[in-house]
Amino acid sequence: MQVRQSIHSDHAKQLDTAGLRREFLIEKIFAADDYTMTYSHIDRIIVGGILPVSKAVSIGNEVGKQLGVSYFLERRELGAINIGGPGLIVVDGQTYDIGNEEALYVGKGAKEVKFSSIDRANPAKFYYNSAPAHTTYPNKKITLAEASPQTLGDDATSNRRTINKYIVPDVLPTCQLSMGLTKLAPGSLWNTMPCHTHERRMEVYFYFDMDEETAVFHMMGQPQETRHLLVHNEQAVISPSWSIHSGVGTKRYTFIWGMVGENQVFGDMDHIAVSELR
């Protein structure tokens, strides 16, 4: 398990490229027949991926000592979205079929969570976020059809996109975790522009569905002190509450967003006009 500390905005704006990447970029999300795990001190979110190819992969129980618990989800909830082939998630003996672009919410207290692929030639790829939880809500599978969609932007501004909200209060109850998948319309390259911050929660962007030559210029930093990260396929960016989070790709891409904090109201954000950015 990698650990990322919180960082003050005054410190962040002094970092060079290597420093920004070290603090905010998660370069490797998937490893065959294993899971990855990055623990951020920012709202205590955990981010990672599970790639079961030739065997099932159980997540996280060996990190109990680092988390101060006897098993991974003793005091946490988890959301996973499959971006690969058809897969299975078994939660304490109950099996869920999770296809491409389908999600599973797992409530606090689940003792064993096991991930597997149906076809090793086309393995499932489960991207997950986990957040501290104070109570137990029911496990729930969410399909793309069951997600709450919202289309924003315009072709003229190259930012037309559909925000598919999988794990939000309109779809199911959680303690604090929210997750969704945003698809850009053909020809659109910008996400979340005009941009925003949200003081009451942090966010992680996971970029995928990109070929080897594609990169996303991910904008971050305070609105008057912007910086950027070059992000490639299947990499994630941690965004503190004080930072904008927006990106433009050299070609098409898709991304999953996950938020943790004290407020789950999707529209609770502070919008920033493009003219105000520096």
Curated annotation (Swiss-Prot):
Keywords assigned by UniProt?
A: Isomerase, Metal-binding, Zinc
Catalyzes what?
Answer: 5-dehydro-4-deoxy-D-glucuronate = 3-deoxy-D-glycero-2,5-hexodiulosonate
* Protein family: Belongs to the KduI family.
Q: Name one GO molecular function term.
A: zinc ion binding
Record bears the keyword Zinc = yes
Stated EC number for the protein is: 5.3.1.17
Query: What would be the name of the gene that encodes this protein?
Result: kduI
Q: Which Gene3D superfamilies match?
A: Jelly Rolls, pectin degrading enzyme 5-keto 4- deoxyuronate isomerase, domain 1
Instruction: State the protein's name.
Output: 4-deoxy-L-threo-5-hexosulose-uronate ketol-isomerase
Tell me, what is an example of a GO biological process annotation in this record? Answer: D-glucuronate catabolic process
Q: What does this protein do?
A: Catalyzes the isomerization of 5-dehydro-4-deoxy-D-glucuronate to 3-deoxy-D-glycero-2,5-hexodiulosonate.
Q: Where are the transmembrane segments?
A: none
